């Protein structure tokens, strides 16, 4: 496993955006560890749960902007106020998270849109920035968990 700093790199060519997404290491979700280790800056994160067969299942891809990654991830792993289906998952299974950092809201929106479209086949879950006709994302993760 190699150590990388989570961040998003960006290049463009005419109406096409090319993003390189560098994830943090996947960590077991614990609100106290999140408080001390996750930065309170803007970025993008994923929440996973480990099912009974010990497989990781992607639960959520989300943007953290004004509240920062720390508060958003903590809020997302808290079962209070969630639907019954999500609440059951949060209370039953082990949860994991990873994140990346970016100061650019447009870049975060583009990458979140691409990941939601790719993972969940639903581009309506988020909106891209509108700057490009085509968006590509390549993922890099220290623990080799890649979905695209």
Describe the residue ranges of each PLM region:
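Boundary/linker segments flanking structured domains
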Residues: 1-59, 63-148
């Amino acid at each position: 496993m190699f150590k990388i700093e989570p961040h998003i790199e960006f290049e463009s060519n005419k109406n096409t955006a090319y993003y390189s997404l560098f994830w943090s290491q996947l960590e077991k979700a614990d609100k106290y560890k999140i408080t001390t280790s996750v930065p309170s800056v803007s970025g993008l994160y994923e929440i996973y749960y480990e099912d009974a067969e010990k497989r990781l299942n992607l639960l959520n891809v989300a943007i953290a902007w004004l509240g920062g990654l720390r508060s958003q991830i903590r809020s997302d792993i808290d079962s209070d106020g969630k639907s019954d289906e999500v609440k059951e998952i949060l209370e039953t299974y082990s949860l994991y998270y990873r994140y990346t950092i970016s100061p650019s809201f447009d870049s975060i929106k583009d990458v979140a849109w691409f990941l939601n479209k790719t993972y969940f086949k639903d581009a309506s879950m988020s909106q891209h920035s509108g700057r490009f006709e085509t968006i590509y994302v390549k993922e890099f993760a220290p623990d080799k968990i890649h979905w695209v």
